[in-house]
Amino acid sequence: MKMKQRIYIDTSVVGGYFDDEFSTDTIPFFDRVRNGEIIVVLSDILEAELLRAPEFVKELLTTIPKEQIENIQLSPEASELADKYIEAKVVGKTSRADCQHIAIATLCKADVLVSWNFKHIVNLDRIRGYNGINYQLGYNMIEIRTPKEITRYGDED
């Protein structure tokens, strides 16, 4: 039996559920979570960002069974790693929360971080930058994908 994937999601994935451009791939992703195929890793950074979201967006996470959720906090080590990404100019200072998402996902050893943020996260140059810092500091590489890449197509073995 295959182990369930532990997938860290950022705020763009929650919002993508309700966005015409991204819902086609985001809704099936959340269906897989609800069906017990995926453990979704949620951070306190995501929770803080969702405080500014409309009520219906916040309520999406309440539709996920508790046993499919792993909650994780921003640790001092993750905060420091996020700062290292910024010091290395992988992204600018205004992208600190994005860096914190990546650092948390790296340190909790999530199987993959899923995002719709193409500017700061799901971007080949940025991914190489984050993983370059991870490698230099002795951390695991982080796999970064969109929900579309996590979707099952037809009957897979």
Pin down the residues of each PLM region.
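C-terminal end-helix/capping segment
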Residues: R126-E143
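A structural signal for short, well-ordered beta-strand segments and their strand-loop junctions
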Residues: Y8-I9, V41-S43, L113-S115, T146
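Short, well-structured N-terminal submotif of metal-dependent ribonuclease cores
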Residues: M1-L42, E49-T63, E87-K93, I127-Y130, ...
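Short, C-terminally biased terminal segments at protein or domain edges
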Residues: G138-D157
